[in-house]
Structure formats: structure tokens, C-alpha cells
Amino acid sequence: MSSLPRDPNHNSELSRRALLWTGAVAALTPWAIDDALAADQPTPAAGAAANAIAPSEALKRLMAGNARYAANKPDQRDFSAGRAARVQGQAPIAAILSCADARLSPEFAFDQAPGELFVTRVAGNILSQDLLASFEYGVEFLGIPLVMVLGHSGCGAVDAAIKRWKDKLVLPGHLPELIGAIKPSVAAAEKMKTGNLLDNSIAENVRRQVAQLKIAAPIVQKSYESKKIDIVGAVYDIPTGKVTLL
């Protein structure tokens, strides 16, 4: 069977198309790709911030994310996606005060994307004037609907407070100030009838920071009392990755 006659312009047309395709791909710089991915993300209603949700919805998202994390089934995330959009501002769904322990990262523990959490970290997850101001900023200017104090199992700062309390441990530098802030929680835990002293002290420390947040920061207090925000406490279990609300 004879072959069909070839169009002499066929190869040149293919070459031209290939050149155009190559140029189009080359034009997709990381910034262009990032913009495209950001544009593909769902957006809230016009005029509404991405975090304009009820405190209960924010908490629901955090706990659902933790369930995924604990089950080792986190969402697939491209941490560069949305970078260009994040240049324009932030709209986190929760502000979290957590311990500085390297084994605890709230973004991973709650399986949240970059920009979703407003995180402050300090050994023992204890409040200070600077941290109170950070939470006031988050609530007043970022519209954050949920504030969480997040302790964790086996907290070294709380354990040091127990040893200082029971064994008169001598600590160097500024550590006595840090441990001194945790001491009231240890004293309260000593009176508890059930559970071990470390676990009880960790939970009590979280509760006390939550109580302080509700009254010590005027902006946060006002928003909490008007039910614009909620303030909760939780403990992260390092062996299992699970977060338990208190």
C-alpha cells in the first residue's frame, strides 16, 4: 500500500508548536506557578477574611487535623503554594501558646498549612507580658477566633519545677524565674488524689495559663466575654501524637 503524500510544512509546523510549548513552560517560573496554585485555592465570600469563622469551627479544624496527624495520614501539602498570596497578609484560624520543646510543632501536630496558625513558643508554655501583647495583636488585628494553650507530655520545664519543689534543685541563670512561674501549678497538683504528679502538673499549668489569658489581657478578655473568640487548653502526647482537650 502506498503511503500518503507528506505535507512539506508538517515538520516545520511541529517544530513551531514545540518551540511555543517550550517557551510557555519556561515562562512558568516558580513565582508564576505559585500564583497559579494560590489562585486555584478556594476563597471565602467577597469581603470576608479567610479566618472569619466561629471559634467552634476553628477548633473542629484543629482537632480533625490532629486526628489525621496521629493516624499518620496528613494532607499532602506544597509549602511553597500560596507563598505569593501570603505576602499580602495573614489570616490564621488560631493563636497557640506552646512549649518550645523541639518535639512539638503545632503546624504539624494539627496538620495545618502555612499561615493557618499564629504560634508563640516558650519553655513551659507560660505567659508573660510580651506574649499577652502578642495574643492581643492576633485577636485585635488579625481577627483570630480561637486561642489555645498547648502543653505536652513529659515537659522538661514542669519536671524541673517539680524537682525544685521537692528536691530543692538549684538552677543557674534565669531558670529560677521560669520555674518559679510553674511552681503554683505543681503545688496545686500535689493536692490531687489521682494521677501522677508530672501529668497533673502539666495539665494544671495549662489550665492556669488559660485562666490568666481570660483576665490578664484586656483585648482578649473583652473578645472572650463577648464570645467573639474562645480560649481553650490542651495537652499533646508525644508518643502518640494525639492532642487532648482539657
Q: Which residues does each predicted region cover?
A:
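Short beta-strand segments
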Residues: 97-99, 121, 148-152, 232-236
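Divalent-metal-activated hydrolytic enzyme cores
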Residues: 20-22, 26, 31, 39-89, ...
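Twin-arginine (Tat) signal peptide motif
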Residues: 11-18, 34
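Short hydrophobic/aromatic-rich motifs at helix boundaries and adjacent loops
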Residues: 9, 105-108, 182, 192-193
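Gly/Ser/Thr-rich loops at beta-strand to alpha-helix junctions
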Residues: 102-103, 153-157
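N-terminal secretory signal peptides
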Residues: 1-14, 25-27
